[in-house]
Amino acid sequence: LHRLIRRQRQMCIRDSARKGNVLTAIDAFQKGAAAGNDIEIIQPEQLHIAPCKGCGACQCYKGCVDKDDTNATIDQIVSADMIVFATPVYWWGMSAQLKQVIDKCYCRGMQLKGKKTGLIVVGGSPVDNIQYELIRKQFDCMADYLSWDMLFQKSYYATARDDLQKNMEALEELENIGSC
């Protein structure tokens, strides 16, 4: 019913430097979400974003003072109704590229309050491994701080580059999540 009233602007921030399982996951999600939503993709691995220096100047200037892709990227994120984060597991955490984008959101963090969000994580260990829990907890903390409505957190096990393409159950689940 919500879709009949208003199209949602969904922002998918996905890091898939290898163009493998995370890309497959977000493609399945998008397939479900495409009807009735405007979807944009942010690909951190293709952006030039310097690490946050913690200088605090952004609080005076209402944006990052770095002359890179930060402010344009954060503008996109702030304008979204829903943000979907998708990442491979790197050393028990999200990818450095995604973390860097999230860190740079500090410059406009309060404008992210109340967003609908979702999380898709793909790793090379079974989904009961601690690595997924650590990432979920980090996103839970962000969601709590920013009053996010965390709609879903999904983890998938895929070791070889195209493993997720063979997992029809996971692809169907992601498509169904996207269509909600």
Language model: regions and residue ranges:
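A short beta-strand-loop structural module common to alpha/beta enzyme folds
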Residues: 37-48
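Helix-loop-strand module that forms the ligand-binding subsite of alpha/beta enzymes
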Residues: 65-146
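A short, Lys/Arg-enriched amphipathic alpha-helix followed by its capping loop at the start of a domain
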Residues: 28-37
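Cysteine-cluster motifs in flexible loop/terminal segments that predominantly coordinate metals
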Residues: 47-77
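Single conserved hydrophobic/aromatic residue that forms the stacking wall/gate
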Residues: 1-13
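Cofactor-binding loop segments of dinucleotide-utilizing enzymes, especially the Rossmann-like FAD-
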Residues: 13-15, 44, 121-124
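Glycine-rich phosphate/pyrophosphate-binding loop and the adjoining helix
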Residues: 33, 140-180
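Short, surface-exposed alpha-helical segments at coil->helix boundaries
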Residues: 23-27, 132-140, 171
